[in-house]
Amino acid sequence: PVCMAHPGTLPVINKQAVHHVLRVGTALGSDLADFTEFDRKNYFYPDIPKGYQISQYKYPLVSNGMLNGVAIERVHLEEDTASSSHEGSEGSLVDYNRAGVPLMELVTKPVIHTAEEAGAFARELQLLLRTLGVSDANMEKGEMRVEANISISKTDKLGTKVEVKNLNSFRSVERAIAYEVERMTKILDGGPGEIVQETRGWDEGGQKTFSQRKKESAHDYRYFPDPDLPKLKISEIPEFANDVLKATMPELPWEKRARLVREYGVKPENAE
């Protein structure tokens, strides 16, 4: 299979997945790329057996945009990795059923300040994805996952970033962020421990995060264009044209709320 990079099993770009990403970008008021390419993100971990992940680095499909008052950095397409289960003490289990499946990744700018803001953003994103019909976005089924990057500092100097991966409910998103903020605050106030750039998981039973692995920087991934996938010229694909994408937009959640308030006199809090 493609996720193993066996000879003769070349990857193919999923046209429908590209279309979904562009529709999300259109709804967000983003800048849609005319040229895009796919890159190899090189790292070693059991969830990616071929040693690299097909992703987008320099030329994402979508840049900028806004959702629920939160600025968007980019939306790109990549392949999903295997899922890992760390229950029990004898070892970990790896499930490759989803490996290689198209995955849309949306990255926000660092403008979310509280766990509650993060939860509200995730809920609005889920509603948007369902409205557009690009995903059922059921978090309990792994169709939508949140990875929270958390950093706090007592000064103007940026703090060390910690990523909590694969949060699969809005409650776990808010609780994991709140836990990390409290943990980091205690360390910065002189408590035991050290804040290092790492990937952490969320223990639902213990209601705490735990270290999984040290987090690499972008240059450590040694991105380079994937030679097995062609570059894309978006303007050469008729159904990806801006006017076509806009014409297929349904009534978006914030538009529906505004219409309920304007035409029917519904209170804004009830329209939500």
Task: List where the protein language model places each region.
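Basic, nucleic-acid-interacting segments
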Residues: 1-249, 268
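Long, charged low-complexity interaction segments
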Residues: 242-272
